[in-house]
């Protein structure tokens, strides 16, 4: 009898011990879940696509082939592999990882193209007209690399690419060549607007102004896709000043600053060179009472 009672007590003691230990691993799982939530809640900067089709989901199509292809995943913001069936599908499908990155990642958009004339032009000027996937009817302008001119088109209101300008003048200043095949006169006009003074211009030989700043400073203001009404600043490359605009809260481009000072620091630093057959003039900007003046520091003139 005594042996049986001891056995029952031992059994109940074991049960109590197991119940006391059970919450420990449950709490551990909970903590792991909390840690995982903290990691995944990290906010990423707004996604900016080069082409609207980069936002499409991977589509293997109705056929049954097994072909390795790549697509741009807007959630991971990377090009990833998927299996394509061999027919139909959509444009977010590339034969190689390199082709996917070239068409859909932002690193490619910030490259600068140098031509044989040593002029500089943002790479997005060479993108094709893209109205986007929305159904708006907004008049915009794009640079047509076939005709070498800025032309009007109808923008849907969302996505699309960076070859998209609100005004014809803005498109011409950024993407079109000057009358002699140089992107000169446009940037020369910018300098005059920045300094509120006349800068000596050569009428005999062509010259070239190079903007040595971030390429996104040359992009137009982009309100974005959402419905907020936040006060922001963008750099207006036509007049050479930072101007306010209303930001919707998502989307848009990198020419977007929370303060005028931040805009000036990002887009007005550096220097501009003037190159011509007659010589090389290096200029640096000096600030004085909120005005910028050109100081000619070094002048190298060739003996004719």
UniProtKB/Swiss-Prot annotation:
Site keyed Not glycosylated: positions: 256
CDD domains membership: Kunitz_TFPI1_1-like (cd22613), Kunitz_TFPI1_2-like (cd22614), Kunitz_TFPI1_TFPI2_3-like (cd22615)
Tissue: Mostly in endothelial cells.
Site (Reactive bond): residue numbering on this chain: 64-65, 135-136, 227-228
GO cellular component, one term: cell surface
Result of altering residue 49 to A: Results in resistance to MMP9-mediated cleavage
Role this protein plays: Inhibits factor X (X(a)) directly and, in a Xa-dependent way, inhibits VIIa/tissue factor activity, presumably by forming a quaternary Xa/LACI/VIIa/TF complex. It possesses an antithrombotic action and also the ability to associate with lipoproteins in plasma.
Protein name in the entry: Tissue factor pathway inhibitor
